[in-house]
From Swiss-Prot:
GO terms for cellular component: chloroplast thylakoid membrane; photosystem II. InterPro entries: D1/D2, Photo_II_D1/D2_sf, Photo_RC_L/M, Photo_RC_L/M_CS, PSII_PsbD/D2. Its EC number is 1.10.3.9. Fe cation binds at residues 215, 269. The modification Phosphothreonine is found at residue 2. It comes from the Eukaryota. Belongs to the reaction center PufL/M/PsbA/D family. Photosystem II (PSII) is a light-driven water:plastoquinone oxidoreductase that uses light energy to abstract electrons from H(2)O, generating O(2) and a proton gradient subsequently used for ATP formation. It consists of a core antenna complex that captures photons, and an electron transfer chain that converts photonic excitation into a charge separation. The D1/D2 (PsbA/PsbD) reaction center heterodimer binds P680, the primary electron donor of PSII as well as several subsequent electron acceptors. D2 is needed for assembly of a stable PSII complex. It is found in: Plastid, Chloroplast thylakoid membrane. The modification N-acetylthreonine is found at residue 2. This is Photosystem II D2 protein. The lineage of its organism: Eukaryota, Viridiplantae, Streptophyta, Embryophyta, Tracheophyta.
Length: 353
């Protein structure tokens, strides 16, 4: 019996190895395999948004002017969602709706699906980029895990919510004022601010801002070696060979302030990761629930009593009336295809009126 000792050798011109060597080469801007997804999708998403906000009207889908060409500014320009009649069509340029006509494709709202889908894959590509780089330099993948929070929010709001409704029409358009309109829509039709998942999202984002402010201030406060530079920011010298702040001093300070404090840096920084990411995940779950038209808190007993007793009113019943007003005033403008008309006498008014 013959035993061959040695290493299996591949063909020197193996295509995969050649691509891997080029993609993962050490350069100023890392490309990587994730870059094959990230860079094209990000380019098309951003380019599509600039094209839409600069040149494309929303007259045929929303009855609105939405581009710089029509007189909008940065706050009012948008890439608008397709009309409700197009339902969940991908609106491909070569599809049955546009039939290869670029102008018609833009008029139908094809740029919105183009930007939304390329944007989603671009964000996923950016997360994969963080995974790939972390693996290359032997880091843990927590940066990528943290970035899954914004991805979850984007996908739930721009893709899953309209998929649960009758069409892409009910997703947010890509613009500043358009997002504000969508927030009003969410409040009026879903009572979103009283949803516990929204509450967790707000607690996560604002809690993270508080944690960042406290953490940054504490580190600056406990510096014990500022370096020997003459300028005001000598503490920011990046060439110091070791840490120059005191965790022990910080622990003692916050123990006196709150009675409790983080005892080690790992738990502290994990908590700073956990709070915002969990908040974003929870808010994304809440939006998925809204896609299915699930209701959160409906205090029916208060509504019944308010209907029976003109003098009984709570902040909850006042908010319900506000939501009815939002629905009534938005529906006629926001859903022109329904030809909704609300006479003055049916618009909601508070008990005091």
């Amino acid at each position: 019996m013959t035993i061959a000792l040695g290493q299996f050798t591949k063909d020197e011109n193996d295509l995969f190895d050649t691509m891997d060597d080029w993609l993962r080469r050490d350069r100023f801007v890392f490309v990587g395999w994730s870059g094959l997804l990230l860079f094209p999708c990000a380019y098309f998403a951003v380019g599509g948004w600039f094209t839409g906000t600069t040149f494309v009207t929303s007259w045929y889908t929303h009855g609105l002017a939405s581009s710089y060409l029509e007189g909008c500014n940065f706050l009012t320009a948008a890439v608008s969602t397709p009309a409700n009649s197009l339902a969940h069509s991908l609106l491909l340029l070569w599809g049955p709706e546009a039939q290869g006509d670029f102008t018609r494709w833009c008029q139908l709202g094809g740029l919105w699906t183009f930007v939304a889908l390329h944007g989603a894959f671009g964000l996923i590509g950016f997360m994969l980029r963080q995974f790939e780089l972390a693996r290359s330099v032997q880091l843990r993948p927590y940066n990528a895990i943290a970035f899954s929070g914004p991805i979850a929010v984007f996908v739930s709001v721009f893709l899953i919510y309209p998929l649960g409704q009758s069409g892409w029409f009910f997703a947010p358009s890509f613009g500043v004022a358009a997002i504000f309109r969508f927030i009003l829509f969410f409040q009026g039709f879903h009572n979103w601010t009283l949803n516990p998942f929204h509450m967790m999202g707000v607690a996560g984002v604002l809690g993270a801002a508080l944690l960042c402010a406290i953490h940054g201030a504490t580190v600056e406060n406990t510096l014990f070696e500022d370096g020997d530079g003459a300028n005001t920011f000598r503490a920011f010298n990046p060439t110091q060979s070791e840490e120059t702040y005191s965790m022990v001093t910080a622990n003692r300070f916050w123990s006196q302030i709150f009675g409790v404090a983080f005892s080690n840096k790992r738990w502290l920084h994990f908590f700073m990761l956990f709070v915002p990411v969990t908040g974003l995940w929870m808010s994304a779950l809440g939006v998925v629930g809204l896609a299915l038209n699930l209701r959160a808190y409906d205090f029916v007993s208060q509504e019944i009593r308010a209907a029976e007793d003109p003098e009984f009113e709570t902040f909850y019943t006042k908010n319900i009336l506000l939501n009815e007003g939002i629905r009534a005033w938005m529906a006629a403008q926001d859903q022109p295809h329904e030809n909704l008309i609300f006479p003055e006498e049916v618009l909601p008014r508070g008990n005091a009126l």
